Each structure stands twice: as C-alpha cells, then as structure tokens.
C-alpha cells in the first residue's frame, strides 16, 4: 500500500480522512489490534473450543446458538459464562424468558454473585440495556435468552389476536444494524440463543429459526446443537445425554467442524474424558494397546486410569491441556469431523458461511 516516495499514512488523502473522521478511520489490516492474537472466550468444552478453530468464541463478534428444546443450549451458555468468569470477565444474562434458575447456574460453576441479570419487559428494552452496559464498559459477555422472547413493544401493548407480521424480524434487523459495529468497537461478545420452529407445507427440511434472517447474516459464528441420545448410569434410569455441536458458520476459522459433548444433569459439560479422547484424535497422546502415553511418560492403562492420573497430578493437567490446545491450533487439526452434508443435517447450505 506504500505510495512511491513515501508511506500512505502521510498522503494528503489519508490525513484528510483522519482529520474529518478521526484516527483509525482508515488503517492497515495488519495494524488492527488482535489481528495476529485473536481474543476468544472458552466455551467450557475443550473439544468445542477446538472445533471453533481459534480456541473459543471470538470477542467483538455476534454468536448464535440454536437447537431443539432440551438440547443443551442453556447449559452451553452457562458454561461459557463460568469460563469467562474464571478468566476475570464480567458477564451479563438477559433473561427475556424469565426462566433462569440461579441455583442451576451455580451448579454449573457460575458465580451468581458476579453475574448481572436483566429481565426486560420488551425486546427494545432488552437491546437498549445491553447497549448501555457495553458503553459503560461494565461487562465483557452478554447472553440473550432467547431471541423468541424478545417481544416487540407494539405486540405487548396490543390486543391478543392482533396481527404483527414481520415485527419481530424488523426489530432484530434494526438492532443488529445499529449494534454490531459497537460490539466490534468495544470488543464484546454477544451470544444469542435461538429456538427452532417448523415451517408448514414446505418441501424438504421444515426447520427454521425465529426472528428472521438478520441474525444469520450478522453472526460470525453459528452453532447447531442437537441431542444425540441418553447415556445410562444404571440399568433402569438415564441421567445424562450426549450432544453434538456443529459449527455451521464461522467467519474466523474453517467452518463445518463438530464436537460431541457429554452433559451431566446438575454438572453441565463433563470434561473428564475430553483431554484423553482429543489427545488420541489429535495424535498428541499415543495409545498402545490399553496404555495411554504422553511424550515422556505413561499416564495410565485404560481411559479411567488416564483420567485419574490427570486428576491427581496437579501440575500436569495444565501442561497436558496446553499441548492439546497447541495441536488444535494447527491449520488442519484431526478429529473434528469433515465437511459433511450440512444442508441436509442442519438445514444450512454451504454457501451460507458469509
């Protein structure tokens, strides 16, 4: 970009733009803060952090998490909040559904005394409160639960049975047009939870998400979370379930990767076997017969003993996880699934990654 005989920073056009619009109105892409060291927040799952490509959910971006009921959306967002708190961040939770249970959140590791909660009356109020919190610098992460519950004021003040066609979609479109630039400027992370609806009388997959198409376009990361099946703890009762999360859109890393999570009731995402399983998939841990080995030492015979080794060696898990994250940061890490027929499985075509 250098001009002959000098740098563009000293050209009359560049100086005029900065004088009129302020410093930073035009800059080199490589000079933007965080361009080489992305700022991310962990999801609370080592496997999902790897599937996302950069080690977590990117700050300064909008993230959408959608899926059927009881698929683990709330559990995933609360674990992300707990991870953010562990890193010193201050999160906020917009409880538009008025359904958050502080006791359940506490069991998942959330420090409820440090969690800001808002229960707005209207969708406009919810979005304005979030914007004011961002401007104050008081919070780093905001979760909006959920898009379907961000009810427009006109609908609340109207009569039951009144038609408000397109009102919700217009609210989301206007809000994202106005707020996305501020989210990037203030380097905040916004997570929208979305429910799934069924379109009537359509050919093919009838699933769709609420709130129109605006969030699909403005979100940098979209996660499709689906419950796969129950995992039994006893012969008669099922307490836990396995969940698959697909990255159907990703503007900061390669998309279409996936991770499988084990979710325990009252505990959240179970990380006990994640490091060992991922280490084997990423070829960072050697499995020979029944023995698991990490470079330089054996960590156990059988997966249970390997997990126990990580549990009783206080200095080792950090080194072990650091090695796993380093392997996940490779350009083409193994073990996170390939480009599958995302259009058929999640309802999102390949071309919707823009």
Curated annotation (Swiss-Prot):
Pfam families: RecA, RecA_C. GO terms for molecular function: ATP binding; ATP hydrolysis activity; ATP-dependent DNA damage sensor activity; damaged DNA binding; single-stranded DNA binding. GO terms for cellular component: cytosol. Gene3D superfamilies: P-loop containing nucleotide triphosphate hydrolases. GO terms for biological process: DNA recombination; DNA repair; SOS response. Its main location: cytoplasm. Keywords: ATP-binding, Cytoplasm, DNA damage, DNA recombination, DNA repair, DNA-binding, Nucleotide-binding, SOS response. ATP binds at residues 67-74. Can catalyze the hydrolysis of ATP in the presence of single-stranded DNA, the ATP-dependent uptake of single-stranded DNA by duplex DNA, and the ATP-dependent hybridization of homologous single-stranded DNAs. It interacts with LexA causing its activation and leading to its autocatalytic cleavage. This is Protein RecA. It comes from Acidocella facilis (Acidiphilium facile). The lineage of its organism: Bacteria, Pseudomonadati, Pseudomonadota, Alphaproteobacteria, Acetobacterales.
